[in-house]
């Protein structure tokens, strides 16, 4: 998938049927909530996201994003590709083998040689790759045929082979703070890509969502979306109902608490 396909899809009408967490993905590093400790000026991710980094020998050729679920690892990889103008290729370590890796690397090399177009190769759950699968990445990383970004919830010191780790910048991501999750939920309630102001939530309900999410941005939006669906269904059955409001009582429903 190219970055044009990826980010163009966010503006398509049918994208409103996608999960809220997908619709609300930041499109630039400046839209990202949290992770300020690794997104400052001059940081590896900022440098990679700069279009001027293409062809640069000083920008990192390999980055390992290490952190718990829901902190933005996939989002950051797609932003780096989109902002810098690189093609985005994605593999899952769960379903991809050595042949899949080599096929992507071959395409990336041909793209670079024939059109001068660089590629971001993103591999989710890279800690699940075997030694031979990780070994297959080394030549392309060394030759800068791709900018490799791997995501892992496991300590890279124990899950990534030493030759690849020594060529990588490790970026540690943290769970979001409560105030950051509050900002995220409030943005999703009003943003045109989110709930468009069609549903409200009390401060107490937002606090409950944040508590249930436990620092996980994706989980907070999943809970919010489920609650919005529940309260919208309730209000639709009432004649003359005003804008639906998410309350702690809605969030306490047994089926909805399973989202957390």
Regions found by a protein language model. Give the residues of each.
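Walker A/P-loop
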Residues: 2-16, 48-92, 106-109, 138-143
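Short glycine-rich substrate-engagement loop in P-loop NTPases that contacts/grips substrate
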Residues: 40-43, 86-120, 130-131
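Loop/turn-to-beta-strand initiation segments
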Residues: 61, 114-120, 143-149, 169
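Helix-loop-helix "sensor" segment of P-loop NTPases
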Residues: 185-206
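C-terminal helical "lid" of AAA+/P-loop NTPase domains
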Residues: 207-212, 218-233, 250-253
């Amino acid at each position: 998938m190219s970055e044009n396909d990826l980010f163009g899809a966010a503006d398509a009408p049918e994208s409103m049927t996608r999960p809220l967490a997908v619709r609300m993905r930041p499109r630039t590093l400046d839209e990202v909530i949290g992770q300020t400790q690794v997104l400052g000026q001059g940081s590896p991710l900022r440098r990679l996201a700069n279009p001027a980094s293409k062809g640069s020998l000083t920008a990192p050729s390999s980055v390992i994003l290490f952190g718990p679920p829901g902190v933005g690892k996939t989002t950051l990889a797609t932003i780096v590709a989109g902002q810098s103008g690189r093609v985005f290729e994605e593999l899952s370590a769960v379903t991809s083998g050595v042949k899949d890796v080599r096929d992507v690397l071959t395409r990336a090399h041909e793209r670079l040689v024939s059109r001068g177009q660089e590629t971001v190769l993103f591999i989710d759950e890279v800690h699940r790759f075997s030694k031979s699968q990780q070994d297959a990445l080394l030549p392309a990383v060394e030759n800068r045929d791709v900018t490799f970004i791997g995501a892992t919830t496991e300590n890279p010191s124990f899950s990534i082979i030493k030759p690849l780790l020594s060529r990588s910048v490790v970026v540690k991501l943290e769970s979001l703070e409560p105030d950051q999750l509050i900002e995220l939920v409030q943005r999703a309630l009003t943003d045109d890509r989110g709930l468009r102001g069609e549903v409200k939530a009390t401060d107490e309900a937002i606090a409950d969502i944040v508590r249930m999410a436990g620092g996980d941005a994706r989980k907070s939006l999943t809970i919010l979306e489920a609650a919005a669906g529940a309260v919208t269904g309730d209000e639709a059955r009432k004649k003359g109902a005003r804008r639906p409001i998410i309350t702690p009582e809605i969030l306490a429903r047994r089926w909805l608490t399973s989202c957390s």
